[in-house]
Amino acid sequence: MTPVSSHGLAESIFDLDYASWKIRSTLAVAGFVFYLGVFVVCHQLSSSLNATYRSLAAKEKVFWNLAATRAVFGVQSTTAGLWALLGDPVLYADKALGQQNWCWFHITTATGFFFFENVAVHLSNLFFRTFDLFLVVHHLFAFLGFLGSAINLRAGHYLAMTTLLLEMSTPFTCISWMLLKAGWSDSLFWKANQWLMIHMFHCRMILTYHMWWVCFCHWDALTSSLHLPHWALFLFGLALLTAVINPYWTHKKTQQLLHPVDWNFAQEEAKGSRQERTNGQVPRKKRL
C-alpha cells in the first residue's frame, strides 16, 4: 500500500459525521465489542499456549485477561494521547475548545472500553463474591467522564486525550503482573520493566499537574463548554488522581520492585501455601 493510499484510509476511518449520535454510539459499541474480543482471544491463546495461565485460579485468569485487554487499550491511548500532547496543531492552539475528528474516534471507542471495564468488574465481583470499592469508583469515574465527552458536541478534546495518556502505565503493569505470576521476578527483564513502570507513574503525576495548569488557564472557556456535572466530575476525579491515586500506585509499584509480591491475590496465595505445607508439598516455581 502506498503512503498516499494509507493516508486516505486513515482519513476515511476518522472522517465521519461525528455530529450524528448514531455514529458516536456505534463507535462506542464497536469499542466495547473490540475489547471484549481482545479479552476472549487472550483467554483462548493463553489457555492453549501458556502453562502459567492454566495453573491459575479462575479469579486470577479473569485478572490476567483484563490486564492484557487494558494493555492493548493502553497502547491505543498512549499513541493518541502523545499525539494530542505533542503533535496536533489544532489542539495545541486551543486547549479548551479545540476538536479533531481523530479525537472523536478515540473518545467514543474509549467510552466503549470503559463500559466494558465496568461490566467486567461488576460481573467479576458478583461471580467471585468480592467488592473493591476503590476499583469500582475508579472505573465508574472513567466511564462517566468519557461518556460526557462523547455526548457533548461543544466539549474540547485536549483534556480528554491527555486523560487517555494516563493509561501509559498499563502495558508495563500487564507485563509486570504476568511475569510475577510466572515466577520471573528475579529476572533482569522483570526488574527493567518495573523501573520503566515506576517512571511511567511519575510521568502520570507530571501530566496531572499539566492538566491542572490547562484548567486554570482556560477556566472560563471550559466552564462554558462543559456541562456542570461533567466539569465537576472531571475536577473531582483529577483531584483524586493528583492527591491519592497516582502517589499511592507509585508507592505500591516501588515497593513491589523491592519486595516482589502479588498483593492482588496475596491472601489466596498465603492460604494456598499453608495448605501445601500441611500436605508436605513444597510450592513449585511456575513457568511460562
Curated annotation (Swiss-Prot):
Record key words, sorted: Endoplasmic reticulum, Membrane, Neurodegeneration, Neuronal ceroid lipofuscinosis, Transmembrane, Transmembrane helix
Region (Disordered): 269-288
Organism: Mus musculus (Mouse)
Subcellular compartments: Endoplasmic reticulum membrane; Endoplasmic reticulum-Golgi intermediate compartment membrane; Endoplasmic reticulum
Disease linkage: Defects in Cln8 are the cause of the phenotype motor neuron degeneration (mnd). Mnd is a naturally occurring mutant It is characterized by progressive motor system degeneration. It has intracellular autofluorescent inclusions similar to those seen in human Cln8.
Pfam families: TRAM_LAG1_CLN8 (PF03798)
Any single Gene Ontology cellular-component annotation: endoplasmic reticulum membrane
Domain of life the protein comes from: Eukaryota
Organism taxonomic ancestry: Eukaryota, Metazoa, Chordata, Craniata, Vertebrata
Protein name as it appears in the record: Protein CLN8
GO molecular-function terms, A-Z: ceramide binding
Entry membrane topology: Multi-pass membrane protein
Keyword Endoplasmic reticulum found: yes
Chain ranges for the short sequence motif ER-retrieval signal as given in the UniProt record: 285-288
Purpose: Could play a role in cell proliferation during neuronal differentiation and in protection against cell death.
